[in-house]
Regions:
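Flexible "cap/lid" subdomain of the alpha/beta-hydrolase fold that forms the substrate-access gate
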Residues: 1-125, 129, 150, 156
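Catalytic histidine-centered segment of alpha/beta-hydrolase-like enzymes
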Residues: 133-142, 146
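Alpha/beta-hydrolase-fold serine-hydrolase catalytic core, especially in secreted/extracellular enzymes
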Residues: 143, 155-158
Length: 158
């Protein structure tokens, strides 16, 4: 609510729910979404025709992206209307469960201050930073991400 940069970065969540952006995303079996994702992934050295075909097959099914859009509709009220009751499970909730966040430093979806603040909510948090990686580290650096997860699990996840 209070971080203006994050508000700007999150504005897509509101515009994709309805209206022109929603229609352009979902028309022609989500073609725009498929094109945008594949265009971004095509820059990766390990992205190949088989992977593109798989993405297009999965994302090209009518309704394939509806669940994500509906999640935004159901769970994120307009910023100016957010109240303490909108926070789930609660505004000051925390966990002691060992937690791992794999964070791409080039992620344009979330501001880095959010990552710094997570320690206040997850007391047993491990953050693994990936330089020059964006919002989808599991797609951009799958070998390293899998190694980090394996190490986290092998060391008692904490």
């Amino acid at each position: 609510q209070t971080n203006e940069t994050q508000r700007e970065r999150s504005s897509y969540m509101y515009s994709m729910r309805d209206g022109d952006l929603n229609r352009s995303m979902t028309q022609n079996n989500n073609q725009r979404v498929c094109d945008n994702i594949c265009r971004g992934l095509s820059k990766l050295p390990h992205f190949n025709e088989d992977m593109e075909r798989t993405f297009r097959q999965g994302l090209g099914v009518p309704g394939a992206i509806d669940a994500g859009i509906n999640w935004y509709r159901a769970n994120i009220p307009p910023v100016d209307a957010i109240t303490d009751e909108d926070f789930w499970p609660g505004k000051h909730a925390s966990t002691s469960v060992p937690s791992l966040l794999i964070w791409g430093d080039a992620d344009l979806t979330f501001v880095s201050e959010f990552i710094d603040d997570l320690a206040g909510y997850a007391e047993n948090l491990r953050v693994h930073h990936l330089p020059e990686v964006g919002h989808s580290p599991m797609l951009e650096q799958p070998v390293e991400v899998n190694a980090v997860i394996r190490h986290f699990l092998a060391t008692g996840a904490g």
